[in-house]
């Protein structure tokens, strides 16, 4: 079933991406002549790593999301900066893992295509291949990005697990993404984990009166309180209990039952458009979810890209040239 879904997605993307020129200079197969081995090399690195640690899928997906939402998809989240002043040192990025996969991919590519492939393109490919490794969606990745030189901890302003629907829609629109993209990309939480500190107020003091969030199913809230005590700072919770290692539709089913882990998950029911998209995924048994996810990932991957002579091609992904 997963293989057939990926085939359908790939066919739809060939029609979509080749029929519409990308004015930003990105295209599928940008390196077809200069580094034809690119995708095979990256895929092998990702699959080898995820065979050993399948839970890396969610952090790698988040890494691409976090990169694109700050300064655009320019690989700035990968940079190490003096005194921990780069993006990766910001609180929302402290839980990112898998930087070694980017490093290993870059090192392997430098052996066969030195100075050709950008780190920002590697990250885009890694995010896709991580989903495929989990039998999730596949899509044609547009390449041609160049790497940014700036990474500033003070510029990290990402959508938050505490955000309401108005803030979420505003943040996504600022990146050229609409309500459907918000819902579909939130579906990536099907493989996610959350930590107790992000739930403390929602479970124990939502309005400052020792109460829980009324938008959270009471039975589910009781289960969460057993796992997350008020002072718990370390326990990790599955965002899609029982299915967090599989990229599937169950996230939307949970949200519709008021069992989304974060306030931002519950918020998807607070707007007529986003609620309709959630219910549509359930009603159609997610028949278009894999395809829609790929479409939204391609759209996000066009955010603020550097192309042409802008930026650079880094020699290593952790430092500018």
Swiss-Prot record:
<keyword id="KW-0376">Hydrogen peroxide</keyword>
<feature type="disulfide bond">
    <location>
        <begin position="196"/>
        <end position="228"/>
    </location>
</feature>
<keyword id="KW-0575">Peroxidase</keyword>
<dbReference type="InterPro" id="IPR019793">
    <property type="entry name" value="Peroxidases_heam-ligand_BS"/>
</dbReference>
<dbReference type="GO" id="GO:0005576">
    <property type="term" value="C:extracellular region"/>
</dbReference>
<feature type="binding site">
    <location>
        <position position="190"/>
    </location>
    <ligand>
        <name>Ca(2+) 2</name>
    </ligand>
</feature>
<dbReference type="GO" id="GO:0020037">
    <property type="term" value="F:heme binding"/>
</dbReference>
<feature type="binding site">
    <location>
        <position position="248"/>
    </location>
    <ligand>
        <name>Ca(2+) 2</name>
    </ligand>
</feature>
<feature type="binding site">
    <location>
        <position position="243"/>
    </location>
    <ligand>
        <name>Ca(2+) 2</name>
    </ligand>
</feature>
<keyword id="KW-0325">Glycoprotein</keyword>
<comment type="similarity">
    <text>Belongs to the peroxidase family. Classical plant (class III) peroxidase subfamily.</text>
</comment>
<protein>
    <recommendedName>
        <fullName>Peroxidase 27</fullName>
        <ecNumber>1.11.1.7</ecNumber>
    </recommendedName>
</protein>
<feature type="disulfide bond">
    <location>
        <begin position="68"/>
        <end position="73"/>
    </location>
</feature>
<feature type="binding site">
    <location>
        <position position="240"/>
    </location>
    <ligand>
        <name>Ca(2+) 2</name>
    </ligand>
</feature>
<feature type="disulfide bond">
    <location>
        <begin position="119"/>
        <end position="317"/>
    </location>
</feature>
<dbReference type="GO" id="GO:0046872">
    <property type="term" value="F:metal ion binding"/>
</dbReference>
<feature type="active site" description="Proton acceptor">
    <location>
        <position position="66"/>
    </location>
</feature>
<dbReference type="GO" id="GO:0006979">
    <property type="term" value="P:response to oxidative stress"/>
</dbReference>
<feature type="site" description="Transition state stabilizer">
    <location>
        <position position="62"/>
    </location>
</feature>
<keyword id="KW-1015">Disulfide bond</keyword>
<feature type="binding site">
    <location>
        <position position="70"/>
    </location>
    <ligand>
        <name>Ca(2+) 1</name>
    </ligand>
</feature>
<feature type="binding site">
    <location>
        <position position="67"/>
    </location>
    <ligand>
        <name>Ca(2+) 1</name>
    </ligand>
</feature>
<dbReference type="InterPro" id="IPR000823">
    <property type="entry name" value="Peroxidase_pln"/>
</dbReference>
<feature type="binding site">
    <location>
        <position position="76"/>
    </location>
    <ligand>
        <name>Ca(2+) 1</name>
    </ligand>
</feature>
<feature type="binding site">
    <location>
        <position position="72"/>
    </location>
    <ligand>
        <name>Ca(2+) 1</name>
    </ligand>
</feature>
<comment type="function">
    <text>Removal of H(2)O(2), oxidation of toxic reductants, biosynthesis and degradation of lignin, suberization, auxin catabolism, response to environmental stresses such as wounding, pathogen attack and oxidative stress. These functions might be dependent on each isozyme/isoform in each plant tissue.</text>
</comment>
<feature type="binding site">
    <location>
        <position position="159"/>
    </location>
    <ligand>
        <name>substrate</name>
    </ligand>
</feature>
<keyword id="KW-0408">Iron</keyword>
<dbReference type="GO" id="GO:0140825">
    <property type="term" value="F:lactoperoxidase activity"/>
</dbReference>
<dbReference type="InterPro" id="IPR033905">
    <property type="entry name" value="Secretory_peroxidase"/>
</dbReference>
<feature type="glycosylation site" description="N-linked (GlcNAc...) asparagine">
    <location>
        <position position="205"/>
    </location>
</feature>
<feature type="binding site" description="axial binding residue">
    <location>
        <position position="189"/>
    </location>
    <ligand>
        <name>heme b</name>
    </ligand>
</feature>
<dbReference type="InterPro" id="IPR010255">
    <property type="entry name" value="Haem_peroxidase_sf"/>
</dbReference>
<keyword id="KW-0349">Heme</keyword>
<keyword id="KW-0732">Signal</keyword>
<dbReference type="InterPro" id="IPR019794">
    <property type="entry name" value="Peroxidases_AS"/>
</dbReference>
<keyword id="KW-0106">Calcium</keyword>
<dbReference type="InterPro" id="IPR002016">
    <property type="entry name" value="Haem_peroxidase"/>
</dbReference>
<feature type="glycosylation site" description="N-linked (GlcNAc...) asparagine">
    <location>
        <position position="164"/>
    </location>
</feature>
<feature type="disulfide bond">
    <location>
        <begin position="35"/>
        <end position="113"/>
    </location>
</feature>
<feature type="binding site">
    <location>
        <position position="74"/>
    </location>
    <ligand>
        <name>Ca(2+) 1</name>
    </ligand>
</feature>
<feature type="signal peptide">
    <location>
        <begin position="1"/>
        <end position="23"/>
    </location>
</feature>
């Amino acid at each position: 079933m997963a293989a057939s879904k990926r085939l359908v997605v790939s066919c739809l993307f060939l029609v979509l991406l080749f029929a519409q020129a990308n004015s930003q200079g990105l295209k599928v197969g940008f390196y077809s002549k200069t580094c034809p081995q690119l995708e095979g090399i990256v895929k092998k690195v990702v699959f080898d790593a995820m065979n050993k640690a399948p839970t890396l899928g969610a952090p790698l997906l988040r890494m691409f999301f976090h990169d694109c939402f700050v300064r655009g998809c320019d690989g700035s989240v990968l940079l190490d900066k003096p005194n921990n002043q780069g993006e990766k040192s910001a609180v929302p990025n402290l839980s990112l893992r898998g930087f070694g996969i980017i490093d290993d991919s870059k090192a392997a590519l430098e052996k066969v295509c030195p100075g050709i492939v950008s780190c920002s393109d590697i990250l885009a490919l890694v995010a896709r291949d991580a989903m495929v490794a989990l039998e999730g969606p596949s899509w044609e990745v547009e390449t041609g990005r160049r790497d940014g030189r700036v990474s500033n901890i003070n510029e990290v302003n990402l959508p938050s697990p505490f955000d309401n629907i108005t803030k979420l829609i505003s943040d996504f629109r600022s990146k050229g993404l609409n309500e459907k993209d918000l819902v579909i990309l939130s579906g990536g939480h099907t493989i996610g984990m959350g930590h107790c500190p992000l739930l403390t107020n929602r479970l124990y003091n939502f309005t400052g009166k020792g109460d829980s969030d009324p938008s959270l199913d009471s039975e589910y809230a009781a289960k969460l309180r057993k796992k997350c005590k008020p002072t718990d700072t370390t326990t990790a919770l599955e965002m899609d209990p029982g299915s967090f290692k599989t990229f599937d539709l169950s996230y939307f089913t949970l949200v519709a039952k008021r069992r989304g882990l974060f306030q931002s998950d519950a918020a998807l029911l607070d707007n007529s458009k986003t609620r309709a998209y959630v219910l549509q995924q359930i009603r159609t048994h997610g028949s278009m979810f894999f395809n829609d996810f790929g479409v939204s990932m391609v759209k996000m991957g066009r955010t603020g890209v550097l192309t042409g002579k802008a930026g650079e091609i880094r020699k290593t992904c952790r430092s500018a040239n």
